[in-house]
């Protein structure tokens, strides 16, 4: 199929072949790899430039993860005679490790890695976060501040009822922006004026409510960090019963993106 699609261009299409070493999502099985490589090499409009696999449990199951590493490395090493003969069958790029694989394992054969989560400055494994710097921050601003009495309910379902007079700030962000509704009721916090402030009640589509009683000088327009350097995305994910990958990729298009380049000075 790809060979026929590439034919009109008159140029070979560079392709990578995926080996299924346990993910079950796609690719050829290891014992089918040699035949698949030979078949791709026989097609006039395709050029095999990469060979890779994907680790299904590098952040959860070290004992299992050693198996695809050994299996993949052994497969690549079985192709070494072709490499020594400089045959065009041999892929130029060999890749296996995701972020967890890069941190915890070492391949004998790969020359590329595919870090995803680490590029955001978030570690998939304990013990490495101190060496990484978060590069993505989700922010909003205080839209409204009200003084509410004891017994006043907050948000849908009145899952939060004030047990004391409280200063409540409404923040302009919600699950319509990608902030997870599932975090409701699990003691989430945001950062305002360098102070952690607890969320009250359920996350709504467009707003959240926060107790700012400890911040008497909090003002409308104050910046609010939902996650970033002070509120780790891993904390948000854990309290939302999900994973950092989902938090990062759930931010919706209606959230403005601002890209900053770090100064070299």
Identify what each model region corresponds to.
Residues 1, 8-9, 66-82, 88-265:
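Active-site anion/phosphate-binding pocket segments in diverse small-molecule metabolic enzymes
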Residues 1-80, 84, 90-95, 108-109:
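Active-site-proximal beta-alpha core segment in soluble small-molecule metabolic enzymes
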């Amino acid at each position: 199929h790809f060979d026929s699609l590439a034919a009109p261009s008159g140029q070979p299409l560079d392709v990578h072949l995926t080996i299924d070493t346990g993910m079950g999502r796609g690719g050829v099985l290891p014992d089918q790899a040699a035949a698949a490589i030979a078949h791709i090499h026989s097609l006039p409009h395709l050029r095999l430039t990469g060979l890779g696999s994907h680790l299904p449990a590098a952040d959860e199951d070290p004992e299992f993860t050693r198996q695809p590493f050994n299996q993949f490395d052994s497969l690549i090493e079985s192709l070494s005679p072709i490499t020594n003969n400089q045959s065009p069958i041999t892929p130029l790029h060999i890749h296996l490790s995701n972020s967890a694989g890069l941190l915890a394992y070492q391949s004998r054969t790969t020359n590329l890695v595919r870090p995803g989560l680490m590029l955001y400055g978030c570690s998939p494994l304990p013990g490495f976060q101190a060496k990484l710097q978060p590069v993505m921050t989700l922010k909003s601003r205080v839209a409204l501040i009200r003084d509410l009495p004891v017994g006043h309910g907050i948000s849908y379902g009145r899952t939060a009822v004030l047990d004391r007079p409280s200063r409540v700030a409404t923040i302009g962000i919600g699950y319509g922006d990608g902030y997870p509704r599932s975090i409701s009721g699990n003691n989430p916090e945001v950062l305002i004026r360098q102070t952690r402030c607890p969320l009250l009640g359920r996350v709504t589509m467009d707003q959240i409510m926060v107790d700012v009683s400890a911040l008497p000088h909090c003002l409308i327009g104050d910046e609010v960090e939902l996650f970033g350097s002070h509120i780790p995305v891993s904390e948000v994910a854990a309290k939302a019963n999900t994973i950092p990958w989902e938090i990062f990729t759930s931010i919706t298009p209606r959230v403005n993106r601002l890209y900053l380049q770090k100064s070299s000075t």
